[in-house]
From Swiss-Prot:
Primary role: NAD-binding protein involved in the addition of a carboxymethylaminomethyl (cmnm) group at the wobble position (U34) of certain tRNAs, forming tRNA-cmnm(5)s(2)U34.
Subunit comment: Homodimer. Heterotetramer of two MnmE and two MnmG subunits.
Keyword NAD: yes
Residues where FAD binds: G13, G14, G15, H16, A17, G18
Domain of life: Bacteria
GO cellular component, one term: cytosol
Upper classification of the organism: Bacteria, Pseudomonadati, Pseudomonadota, Gammaproteobacteria, Oceanospirillales
Gene Ontology biological process terms, A to Z: tRNA methylation; tRNA wobble uridine modification
Subcellular location: Cytoplasm
Protein name (database record): tRNA uridine 5-carboxymethylaminomethyl modification enzyme MnmG
GO molecular function, one term: flavin adenine dinucleotide binding
Keywords: Cytoplasm, FAD, Flavoprotein, NAD, tRNA processing
UniProt-annotated binding residues for NAD(+): 273-287
Amino acid sequence: MDYPDRFDVIVIGGGHAGTEAALAAARMGCQTLLLTHNIETLGQMSCNPAIGGIGKSHLVKEIDALGGAMAHATDLGGIQFRVLNARKGPAVRATRAQADRVRYKAAIRGMLENQPNLTLFQQAADDLIVENDTVRGVVTQTGIRVFGESVVLCTGTFLGGVIHIGLDHHAGGRAGDPPSNALAQRLRALPFHVDRLKTGTPPRLDAKSVDFSVLETQPGDDPTPVMSYLGRRDQHPRQVACHIAHTNARTHEIIHANLDRSPMYSGVIGGVGPRYCPSIEDKVNRFADKSSHQIFVEPEGLDTHELYPNGISTSLPFDVQFEVVRSIKGFENAHITRPGYAIEYDFFDPRDLKHSLETKFIHNLFFAGQINGTTGYEEAAAQGLLAGLNAARRAQGQDAWSPRRDEAYLGVLVDDLITMGTQEPYRMFTSRAEHRLLLREDNADLRLTEIGRELGLVDDTRWAHFSTKREAIARETERLRETWVQPSSELAKRLSGKLDKPLAREYRLADLLKRPELNHADLADDAPELDPAVAEQVQIQAKYQGYIARQQDEIDRLRRHEALRLPEDLDYARIDGLSHEIRQKLEAARPETLAQAGRISGVTPAAVSLLLVHLKKRRLIEDQDVQAVNA
């Protein structure tokens, strides 16, 4: 049968990518359908119960700045919050939260069920309706045909998913859930490049059987950070500690003796695993000189005794897992509640996507999350939001939007994927961003909320909060610029204790704040009390003003390349001087801009210059554009 309603946007998958995609499209006014094989697992944290971390919290804050759900759900479900790299510069500071799985999932489901324009439907998707290279809808497992203007695929690890425990394996999207094999076969029949990746999870432990007295305690921060720009500490549930354990020589002996029973080392698994979250087998094998590896013992929630031992992800047989766990100090009597496993799944080469995450071969079809070769809740959620908003814009007849690399980590993530592709699960790090001094987690709202408002993603409450904050920053910045301190003033006398030498002349407060010895609180005696987030922003902008200005100049030069778009039908075979190899790379990637072409591995600056000359010859760009690029 045909579903009685037609939708603007259909989202397949209810994980972190799918939920953000559906919420984004619905916030923009599109009639949106979220298809999931099980409504009870919406927003499920399939791997570790944590949100944020280095590079990842930057994405979470950007999602939040654009009106997304992840940060708010984290504030409602977070049971431990910490700021990582707190003693380093603001560009690399990152908030990380341990989350209660049940509370987090409930928060996401609550937002979905209360979002206007959004319909939830428990049905697995088995097929796509494609006509004239354009997706028209979806066919469910029970044969229901649902029609829509745009479709977003957020299938996670479910496409052709195979779960491995030792040399035994079975089909599955994750533990306890079936795979999406019919949809995987349908996608393989379309002109996409497909490959396999793998990820894994550790055995879960019963806290009642763990000896915490011999483990290192890892408390959260006090005062507790918040994840959302609208977050409040009183939203947080009860806070708890995590703990740290360590593997040892005996643990490593057990693993080495059983590598022939590992599906990874016996050739059963062909997919590549995440480099930055390796299995314990990988760690012991690759880092044979290390006598010990850390294990972060993370509580799964406030109402359960289950623990997540982060650091011993494994696909070894259960009897070996049992020995490994019992060999660890503090785990000598530990009871395993669920065995660890590896899962192998299909992913599609993200170079087959545009910046909007729409596929190049099938119009109105968008991919987001692990289907694009990424790993991590945060990376998936960020892609989901972008794909959802662009699916909505496509349905509304509007042009696509995507942030540039200098505007957001989301821009870095997408540009890396669609330009270079990935041979292993892609994880975000601050080191991937060239302009990370501008892309801090503390200023994601200043970078993106105004854009989000224009796109229709940001509601009145968030906009009012943001506007108040932005105005307060401007007022305080102006006060610091206009206020002068005389050497004989009381403030100057108080500051002399913090400075190398007393002030010898008058200074503006703004100039004093640039000094490393002083912070905003030292200069705020006569000012109205400021929100800490406002004071932090004023201080960072003052202290890093010179560095930020230099980085902005560099960005302005790069933007000239970004502005030069390459025609979709550009025939690289007709461009004189390009090597056969470079022609092949450009033809395969089909870059959208001159700057993107320059970021393709193996495409030289000389080749970019040849592209520029060719465009000028074909009068595809104006002479002044070429002059601007060469300036």
